[in-house]
Amino acid sequence: NPVIKNPGLRDFRDPKVMWYEPQKKWIMSLATKNNVTFYSSPDLKKWIKESDFGDGRGAHGGGWECPDLITLDDSGKQRWVLIVSLNPGGPNMGSATQYFVGDFDGKTFTSSQTATQWIDYGPDNYAGITWSNTGNRKIFIGWMSNWLYANLVPTEKWRNAMTLPRDLKLKHVGENIYLTSQPVSELSAIQSKPVTVHNVKVTASTDLSSKTGGVKFPCQLTLDMEEVKDFRLVLSNTAGEELIIGYDKKQNQYFIDRTKSGKTDFQKDFANRHVAPRLSDNGKMDISLIIDVSSVELFADEGLSAMTEIFFPNKPYTQIRLESGSNIVIKTMEYIALSAYN
Protein backbone atom coordinates (compact mmCIF):
# COMPACT_ATOMS: atom_id res chain seq x y z
CA ASN A 1 0.00 0.00 0.00
CA PRO A 2 1.62 3.28 -1.07
CA VAL A 3 1.76 5.80 1.75
CA ILE A 4 2.72 9.44 2.04
CA LYS A 5 5.87 10.10 4.04
CA ASN A 6 5.23 11.89 7.31
CA PRO A 7 7.03 15.27 7.20
CA GLY A 8 7.67 15.05 10.94
CA LEU A 9 4.26 15.75 12.45
CA ARG A 10 2.97 13.95 15.52
CA ASP A 11 -0.53 13.93 14.05
CA PHE A 12 -0.52 12.82 10.42
CA ARG A 13 -3.63 10.71 10.22
CA ASP A 14 -7.14 9.74 9.15
CA PRO A 15 -6.89 9.85 5.33
CA LYS A 16 -10.18 10.08 3.41
CA VAL A 17 -9.91 9.66 -0.37
CA MET A 18 -12.37 10.78 -3.04
CA TRP A 19 -12.43 11.01 -6.83
CA TYR A 20 -12.33 14.55 -8.29
CA GLU A 21 -14.00 14.22 -11.67
CA PRO A 22 -13.23 17.69 -13.16
CA GLN A 23 -9.48 16.96 -13.16
CA LYS A 24 -9.65 13.15 -13.26
CA LYS A 25 -7.64 12.63 -10.10
CA TRP A 26 -7.91 11.38 -6.56
CA ILE A 27 -8.03 13.81 -3.63
CA MET A 28 -6.93 12.84 -0.15
CA SER A 29 -7.94 14.86 2.92
CA LEU A 30 -5.47 14.26 5.74
CA ALA A 31 -5.52 15.48 9.34
CA THR A 32 -2.20 17.21 10.03
CA LYS A 33 -2.03 18.50 13.59
CA ASN A 34 -4.42 21.51 13.58
CA ASN A 35 -5.06 21.56 9.84
CA VAL A 36 -6.34 19.52 6.94
CA THR A 37 -3.81 18.91 4.17
CA PHE A 38 -5.00 18.04 0.67
CA TYR A 39 -3.04 15.70 -1.59
CA SER A 40 -3.79 14.63 -5.16
CA SER A 41 -2.89 11.56 -7.21
CA PRO A 42 -3.68 10.27 -10.71
CA ASP A 43 -3.21 6.63 -9.71
CA LEU A 44 -3.40 6.31 -5.88
CA LYS A 45 0.37 5.70 -5.90
CA LYS A 46 2.12 9.01 -6.46
CA TRP A 47 0.80 11.78 -4.22
CA ILE A 48 1.38 15.54 -4.51
CA LYS A 49 0.70 17.98 -1.69
CA GLU A 50 -1.74 20.63 -2.89
CA SER A 51 -2.64 22.88 0.07
CA ASP A 52 -3.48 23.27 3.75
CA PHE A 53 -6.66 24.52 5.39
CA GLY A 54 -7.24 25.44 9.01
CA ASP A 55 -5.02 28.24 10.26
CA GLY A 56 -7.26 30.79 11.92
CA ARG A 57 -10.40 28.94 10.84
CA GLY A 58 -12.98 27.25 13.03
CA ALA A 59 -12.37 25.74 16.46
CA HIS A 60 -8.86 24.83 17.61
CA GLY A 61 -9.30 23.62 21.18
CA GLY A 62 -7.50 20.42 20.24
CA GLY A 63 -6.08 18.47 17.35
CA TRP A 64 -8.08 18.06 14.14
CA GLU A 65 -9.14 14.56 13.15
CA CYS A 66 -11.19 12.56 10.64
CA PRO A 67 -11.54 15.10 7.79
CA ASP A 68 -14.16 14.43 5.12
CA LEU A 69 -14.57 16.55 1.97
CA ILE A 70 -17.97 16.15 0.29
CA THR A 71 -20.25 17.89 -2.19
CA LEU A 72 -23.89 18.78 -1.59
CA ASP A 73 -26.57 20.26 -3.81
CA ASP A 74 -27.64 23.83 -3.08
CA SER A 75 -30.63 24.62 -5.31
CA GLY A 76 -28.89 23.18 -8.36
CA LYS A 77 -25.45 24.52 -7.45
CA GLN A 78 -22.72 22.25 -6.14
CA ARG A 79 -21.18 23.30 -2.85
CA TRP A 80 -18.28 21.75 -1.01
CA VAL A 81 -18.40 20.92 2.69
CA LEU A 82 -15.39 20.02 4.82
CA ILE A 83 -16.22 18.02 7.95
CA VAL A 84 -13.56 18.01 10.70
CA SER A 85 -13.56 16.51 14.20
CA LEU A 86 -11.50 17.91 17.05
CA ASN A 87 -10.65 16.92 20.60
CA PRO A 88 -11.05 18.79 22.88
CA GLY A 89 -12.79 22.06 22.04
CA GLY A 90 -16.41 21.08 21.38
CA PRO A 91 -19.34 23.42 22.10
CA ASN A 92 -20.30 21.41 25.20
CA MET A 93 -16.80 20.31 26.27
CA GLY A 94 -14.66 17.49 24.98
CA SER A 95 -14.70 16.11 21.46
CA ALA A 96 -17.05 17.26 18.69
CA THR A 97 -17.37 17.69 14.92
CA GLN A 98 -17.38 21.00 13.04
CA TYR A 99 -17.95 21.77 9.37
CA PHE A 100 -17.10 24.42 6.78
CA VAL A 101 -19.19 25.27 3.72
CA GLY A 102 -17.10 26.52 0.81
CA ASP A 103 -15.51 25.73 -2.55
CA PHE A 104 -12.80 23.40 -3.82
CA ASP A 105 -10.93 23.74 -7.13
CA GLY A 106 -8.98 20.51 -7.06
CA LYS A 107 -6.14 22.09 -5.14
CA THR A 108 -7.45 24.47 -2.48
CA PHE A 109 -10.48 24.50 -0.20
CA THR A 110 -11.79 27.99 0.60
CA SER A 111 -14.62 29.14 2.83
CA SER A 112 -16.06 32.56 3.63
CA GLN A 113 -17.66 31.13 6.77
CA THR A 114 -16.60 33.10 9.83
CA ALA A 115 -18.55 31.48 12.69
CA THR A 116 -17.75 27.96 13.87
CA GLN A 117 -20.56 25.57 12.92
CA TRP A 118 -21.15 22.17 14.50
CA ILE A 119 -22.72 19.16 12.85
CA ASP A 120 -24.09 18.14 16.27
CA TYR A 121 -24.11 20.24 19.44
CA GLY A 122 -24.54 17.33 21.84
CA PRO A 123 -21.45 15.90 23.55
CA ASP A 124 -21.77 12.42 22.06
CA ASN A 125 -21.25 12.55 18.30
CA TYR A 126 -17.63 12.41 17.23
CA ALA A 127 -15.29 11.26 14.44
CA GLY A 128 -18.13 10.90 11.96
CA ILE A 129 -17.65 10.40 8.22
CA THR A 130 -19.80 9.81 5.16
CA TRP A 131 -20.18 6.70 3.03
CA SER A 132 -19.12 6.48 -0.59
CA ASN A 133 -21.34 5.07 -3.37
CA THR A 134 -24.62 6.46 -2.01
CA GLY A 135 -25.69 8.23 -5.21
CA ASN A 136 -26.76 11.82 -4.66
CA ARG A 137 -27.17 11.26 -0.93
CA LYS A 138 -24.50 12.01 1.65
CA ILE A 139 -24.99 9.70 4.62
CA PHE A 140 -23.08 10.40 7.83
CA ILE A 141 -22.50 8.27 10.93
CA GLY A 142 -20.63 9.19 14.10
CA TRP A 143 -19.22 7.58 17.22
CA MET A 144 -21.68 8.07 20.07
CA SER A 145 -19.37 9.05 22.91
CA ASN A 146 -16.88 11.68 24.06
CA TRP A 147 -13.18 11.36 24.86
CA LEU A 148 -13.87 13.03 28.22
CA TYR A 149 -15.36 9.77 29.50
CA ALA A 150 -15.34 7.17 26.71
CA ASN A 151 -13.18 4.77 28.74
CA LEU A 152 -15.09 5.36 31.97
CA VAL A 153 -18.75 4.78 31.07
CA PRO A 154 -20.47 2.24 33.38
CA THR A 155 -21.10 -0.53 30.87
CA GLU A 156 -20.42 -4.27 30.67
CA LYS A 157 -19.41 -6.32 27.61
CA TRP A 158 -19.70 -3.27 25.37
CA ARG A 159 -18.51 0.31 25.45
CA ASN A 160 -20.03 3.07 23.33
CA ALA A 161 -22.05 2.81 20.12
CA MET A 162 -22.69 4.60 16.83
CA THR A 163 -25.27 7.26 15.98
CA LEU A 164 -28.04 6.59 13.53
CA PRO A 165 -26.98 7.13 9.92
CA ARG A 166 -28.03 10.64 8.90
CA ASP A 167 -28.82 12.31 5.60
CA LEU A 168 -26.88 15.56 5.20
CA LYS A 169 -28.29 18.51 3.27
CA LEU A 170 -27.81 22.27 3.02
CA LYS A 171 -30.37 24.84 4.12
CA HIS A 172 -30.39 28.65 3.94
CA VAL A 173 -31.55 30.76 6.89
CA GLY A 174 -31.34 34.44 6.01
CA GLU A 175 -27.83 35.10 4.72
CA ASN A 176 -26.41 31.98 6.35
CA ILE A 177 -26.13 28.46 5.01
CA TYR A 178 -26.16 25.48 7.36
CA LEU A 179 -25.64 21.75 7.20
CA THR A 180 -28.74 19.83 8.30
CA SER A 181 -28.91 16.22 9.42
CA GLN A 182 -31.88 13.90 9.75
CA PRO A 183 -32.27 10.13 10.23
CA VAL A 184 -32.11 8.18 6.98
CA SER A 185 -35.40 7.10 5.42
CA GLU A 186 -34.33 3.45 5.80
CA LEU A 187 -35.33 3.80 9.46
CA SER A 188 -38.86 3.01 8.26
CA ALA A 189 -37.84 -0.66 7.97
CA ILE A 190 -37.92 -1.01 11.77
CA GLN A 191 -40.83 1.32 12.50
CA SER A 192 -44.10 0.02 13.92
CA LYS A 193 -47.48 1.55 13.16
CA PRO A 194 -47.48 5.22 14.27
CA VAL A 195 -49.65 6.40 17.14
CA THR A 196 -50.72 9.93 16.23
CA VAL A 197 -52.41 12.43 18.56
CA HIS A 198 -53.58 15.90 17.53
CA ASN A 199 -53.96 19.15 19.48
CA VAL A 200 -52.33 18.10 22.74
CA LYS A 201 -52.80 20.94 25.23
CA VAL A 202 -49.96 21.27 27.72
CA THR A 203 -50.29 23.37 30.85
CA ALA A 204 -48.01 22.70 33.82
CA SER A 205 -47.48 19.00 33.17
CA THR A 206 -49.03 16.51 30.75
CA ASP A 207 -48.44 12.76 30.77
CA LEU A 208 -47.65 11.61 27.24
CA SER A 209 -47.23 7.94 28.13
CA SER A 210 -50.98 7.40 28.43
CA LYS A 211 -51.60 9.10 25.10
CA THR A 212 -49.28 6.70 23.29
CA GLY A 213 -50.61 3.55 24.95
CA GLY A 214 -47.41 3.08 26.92
CA VAL A 215 -43.78 3.73 26.12
CA LYS A 216 -41.30 1.23 24.74
CA PHE A 217 -37.71 1.98 23.81
CA PRO A 218 -36.26 2.37 21.27
CA CYS A 219 -38.82 4.73 19.80
CA GLN A 220 -39.23 7.79 17.64
CA LEU A 221 -41.19 10.71 19.06
CA THR A 222 -42.09 13.67 16.86
CA LEU A 223 -43.65 16.94 18.04
CA ASP A 224 -44.99 19.66 15.73
CA MET A 225 -45.86 23.01 17.33
CA GLU A 226 -47.53 26.04 15.80
CA GLU A 227 -45.67 28.42 18.12
CA VAL A 228 -42.14 28.65 19.49
CA LYS A 229 -42.49 28.40 23.26
CA ASP A 230 -40.66 27.00 26.28
CA PHE A 231 -41.12 23.30 26.95
CA ARG A 232 -39.53 20.42 28.85
CA LEU A 233 -39.90 16.80 27.81
CA VAL A 234 -39.06 14.59 30.80
CA LEU A 235 -38.13 10.90 30.65
CA SER A 236 -38.34 9.35 34.12
CA ASN A 237 -38.27 6.07 36.04
CA THR A 238 -39.39 4.67 39.40
CA ALA A 239 -35.98 5.49 40.91
CA GLY A 240 -36.65 9.22 40.61
CA GLU A 241 -34.13 9.66 37.81
CA GLU A 242 -34.90 11.82 34.80
CA LEU A 243 -33.55 13.07 31.52
CA ILE A 244 -34.86 16.47 30.43
CA ILE A 245 -35.04 17.61 26.80
CA GLY A 246 -36.38 21.06 26.04
CA TYR A 247 -36.30 24.53 24.57
CA ASP A 248 -35.52 27.83 26.31
CA LYS A 249 -37.13 30.64 24.32
CA LYS A 250 -35.34 33.44 26.19
CA GLN A 251 -31.95 31.98 25.31
CA ASN A 252 -33.22 30.59 21.97
CA GLN A 253 -31.59 27.27 22.80
CA TYR A 254 -32.49 23.62 22.79
CA PHE A 255 -31.11 21.72 25.75
CA ILE A 256 -30.62 18.25 27.16
CA ASP A 257 -30.07 17.93 30.91
CA ARG A 258 -28.70 14.63 32.20
CA THR A 259 -27.74 15.92 35.66
CA LYS A 260 -30.15 13.49 37.37
CA SER A 261 -30.29 10.88 34.62
CA GLY A 262 -28.84 7.97 36.65
CA LYS A 263 -25.21 6.90 36.90
CA THR A 264 -23.23 10.11 36.46
CA ASP A 265 -20.41 10.08 39.02
CA PHE A 266 -17.90 8.15 36.90
CA GLN A 267 -16.61 11.46 35.45
CA LYS A 268 -16.88 14.97 36.86
CA ASP A 269 -18.30 16.64 33.74
CA PHE A 270 -20.81 13.98 32.69
CA ALA A 271 -23.69 15.28 34.84
CA ASN A 272 -24.41 18.47 32.97
CA ARG A 273 -26.89 20.51 30.96
CA HIS A 274 -25.92 20.90 27.30
CA VAL A 275 -27.30 23.45 24.84
CA ALA A 276 -27.65 24.01 21.11
CA PRO A 277 -28.70 27.26 19.40
CA ARG A 278 -31.99 27.33 17.53
CA LEU A 279 -30.84 28.31 14.04
CA SER A 280 -34.26 28.41 12.39
CA ASP A 281 -36.16 31.68 11.96
CA ASN A 282 -39.46 29.87 11.41
CA GLY A 283 -42.34 30.76 13.72
CA LYS A 284 -43.21 27.08 13.98
CA MET A 285 -41.18 24.31 15.59
CA ASP A 286 -40.73 20.61 14.83
CA ILE A 287 -38.72 18.17 16.90
CA SER A 288 -37.92 14.52 16.23
CA LEU A 289 -36.34 12.36 18.94
CA ILE A 290 -34.85 8.90 18.59
CA ILE A 291 -34.85 7.56 22.15
CA ASP A 292 -33.13 4.32 23.13
CA VAL A 293 -32.54 2.80 26.55
CA SER A 294 -29.32 4.80 27.03
CA SER A 295 -29.21 7.43 24.28
CA VAL A 296 -31.23 10.17 22.64
CA GLU A 297 -30.73 11.85 19.27
CA LEU A 298 -32.55 15.16 18.76
CA PHE A 299 -33.29 16.68 15.35
CA ALA A 300 -35.05 20.05 15.44
CA ASP A 301 -36.37 22.35 12.71
CA GLU A 302 -35.84 19.91 9.84
CA GLY A 303 -32.41 19.00 11.18
CA LEU A 304 -30.96 22.50 11.57
CA SER A 305 -30.20 21.82 15.24
CA ALA A 306 -29.01 18.36 16.28
CA MET A 307 -27.93 16.96 19.64
CA THR A 308 -26.79 13.49 20.69
CA GLU A 309 -26.49 12.36 24.32
CA ILE A 310 -25.87 9.11 26.17
CA PHE A 311 -27.12 8.37 29.70
CA PHE A 312 -27.15 5.46 32.16
CA PRO A 313 -30.29 5.16 34.31
CA ASN A 314 -30.27 2.64 37.16
CA LYS A 315 -33.73 1.53 36.10
CA PRO A 316 -35.33 1.83 32.65
CA TYR A 317 -37.23 5.00 31.87
CA THR A 318 -40.93 4.16 31.65
CA GLN A 319 -42.68 7.54 31.66
CA ILE A 320 -42.70 10.59 29.39
CA ARG A 321 -44.29 13.87 30.38
CA LEU A 322 -44.33 17.32 28.81
CA GLU A 323 -44.05 20.44 30.93
CA SER A 324 -44.55 24.09 30.01
CA GLY A 325 -45.45 27.33 31.69
CA SER A 326 -46.54 28.79 28.35
CA ASN A 327 -49.73 26.77 27.73
CA ILE A 328 -48.46 25.30 24.49
CA VAL A 329 -50.42 23.19 22.05
CA ILE A 330 -48.77 20.28 20.27
CA LYS A 331 -50.44 20.32 16.86
CA THR A 332 -49.33 16.78 16.09
CA MET A 333 -47.55 14.23 18.26
CA GLU A 334 -46.41 10.96 16.69
CA TYR A 335 -45.01 8.00 18.61
CA ILE A 336 -43.41 5.09 16.75
CA ALA A 337 -41.91 2.05 18.45
CA LEU A 338 -38.75 0.77 16.76
CA SER A 339 -38.08 -2.95 16.46
CA ALA A 340 -34.29 -2.74 16.49
CA TYR A 341 -33.88 -5.74 18.78
CA ASN A 342 -36.29 -8.09 17.00
Q: Which residues does each predicted region cover?
A:
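Conserved Ser/Thr-centered positions that define the repeating blades of beta-propeller domains
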Residues: 38-44
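Beta-rich accessory regions
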Residues: 75, 103-342
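Acidic, glycine-rich loop-and-beta core segments that form the ion-binding/anion-interacting portion
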Residues: 72-74, 80-81, 87-108
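Surface loop/turn signatures of beta-propeller and other carbohydrate-active proteins
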Residues: 1-19, 30, 48-71, 108-128, ...
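Short, solvent-exposed loop/turn segments at conserved positions within beta-propeller repeat blades
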Residues: 30-34, 91-96, 159
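Hydrophobic beta-strand segments that make up the repeating blades of beta-propeller
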Residues: 26-30, 80-83
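Short glycine/acidic-enriched loop and turn motifs that connect beta-strands
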Residues: 34-35, 87-90, 147-148
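Residue-level detector of Asp-centered blade-edge/turn motifs that repeat once per structural unit
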Residues: 19-24, 72-77, 133-136
